[in-house]
């Protein structure tokens, strides 16, 4: 009797769960990076499925910058309490003491100190030898050429010219002391796959993904949400209310909203079917300079 044929989403789910289970079995001290966005929410859901009815056998790590949307932090804490996973948070103490922020120091310096260096500090502090990330190959060109198991040296650096072959979904997780692997279970998913899976599995998300009236400032052709009193206005700028949503989430001064009426999963999926713009066009850190994402990854960014 022929076996039941899996749907496209079921195939992706099975592949991701297999990767998560393999890493948990193969590595001594894995961790799942939790950025609180839609991809992290899907990855968390897959990890819960992978080990159900038991608990996730590794912690989740959120590298905080001090500039995430308030709704993101509230959602993070609610999810940890609801599902009972171990949540670790880290913020770069040196950057915090220096008052590093995206307004006064710029996106490149802020991202390097508070995200890249903060991540490396946390990985070193806890001695993690494998770190799950929610990146997908369709997001950005440097991620398109990265392996599922992405080898990092003792300094957490990625060398795109020195990647290990992955034939027939066979992954090489051999590392020496101090080295590590970044693991991307969602590598073969697309943005549309993510949204359709969220709809299918009824996965909770930060409300910022759904259209609503929000206070924003138009800056450089982008809509930046005034999330708290630290928002700095340039001369002539005014805060106004617009119906917007976010396609991607990060530090609020570096993440642009988009005009949208999509206030439900069905409407977001319909919008995704029609869009021709890049998912990361709202991430201001990607426009620092040419090939900036690859340079960040070479330095240790996830």
Swiss-Prot record:
EC number: 2.7.7.4
Molecular function per GO: ATP binding; sulfate adenylyltransferase (ATP) activity
Family the UniProt entry places it in: Belongs to the PAPS reductase family. CysD subfamily.
Assembly description: Heterodimer composed of CysD, the smaller subunit, and CysN.
Catalytic activity: sulfate + ATP + H(+) = adenosine 5'-phosphosulfate + diphosphate
InterPro entries according to UniProt: PAPS_reduct_dom, Rossmann-like_a/b/a_fold, SO4_adenylTrfase_ssu, Sulfate_adenylyltrnsfr_sub2
Physiological role: With CysN forms the ATP sulfurylase (ATPS) that catalyzes the adenylation of sulfate producing adenosine 5'-phosphosulfate (APS) and diphosphate, the first enzymatic step in sulfur assimilation pathway. APS synthesis involves the formation of a high-energy phosphoric-sulfuric acid anhydride bond driven by GTP hydrolysis by CysN coupled to ATP hydrolysis by CysD.
Protein name: Sulfate adenylyltransferase subunit 2
SUPFAM superfamilies: Adenine nucleotide alpha hydrolases-like
Pfam family, one: PAPS_reduct
NCBIfam families: CysD, PRK05253.1, PRK12563.1
Region (Disordered): 280-302
Keyword DNA repair: no
Keyword vocabulary terms for this entry: ATP-binding, Nucleotide-binding, Nucleotidyltransferase, Transferase
Pathways involved: Sulfur metabolism; hydrogen sulfide biosynthesis; sulfite from sulfate: step 1/3
GO annotation, biological process: hydrogen sulfide biosynthetic process; sulfate assimilation
Matching PANTHER family: SULFATE ADENYLYLTRANSFERASE SUBUNIT 2 (PTHR43196:SF1)
């Amino acid at each position: 009797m022929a076996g039941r044929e899996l749907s496209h989403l079921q195939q992706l789910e099975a592949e991701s769960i297999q990767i998560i289970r393999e890493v948990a079995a193969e590595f001594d001290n894995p961790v799942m990076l939790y950025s609180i966005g839609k991809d992290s929410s899907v990855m968390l859901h897959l990890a819960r499925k992978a080990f159900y009815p038991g608990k996730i056998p590794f912690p989740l790590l959120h590298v905080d910058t001090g500039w995430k949307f308030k709704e993101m932090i509230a959602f993070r804490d609610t999810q940890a309490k609801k599902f009972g996973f171990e949540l670790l948070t880290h913020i770069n103490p040196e950057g915090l003491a220096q008052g590093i922020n995206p307004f006064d120091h710029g996106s490149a310096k802020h991202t390097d100190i508070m995200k890249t260096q903060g991540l490396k500090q946390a990985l070193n502090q806890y001695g993690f030898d494998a770190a799950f990330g929610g990146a997908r190959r369709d997001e950005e060109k440097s991620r398109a050429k990265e392996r599922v198991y992405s080898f990092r040296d003792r300094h957490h650096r990625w060398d795109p010219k020195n990647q290990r072959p992955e034939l027939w979904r066979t992954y090489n997780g051999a590392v020496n002391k101090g080295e590590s692997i970044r693991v991307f279970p969602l590598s073969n998913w697309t943005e549309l796959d993510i949204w359709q899976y969220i709809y299918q599995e009824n996965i909770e998300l930060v409300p910022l993904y759904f259209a609503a009236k929000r206070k924003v400032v138009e800056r450089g052709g982008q809509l930046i949400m005034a999330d708290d009193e630290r928002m700095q206005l340039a001369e002539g700028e005014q805060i106004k209310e617009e119906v917007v949503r976010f396609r991607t989430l990060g530090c609020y001064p570096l993440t642009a909203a988009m005009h949208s009426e999509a206030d439900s999963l069905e409407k977001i999926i319909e919008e995704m079917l029609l869009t021709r713009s890049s998912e990361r066009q709202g991430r201001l850190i990607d426009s620092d300079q040419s090939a900036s994402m690859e340079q960040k990854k070479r330095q240790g960014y996830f």
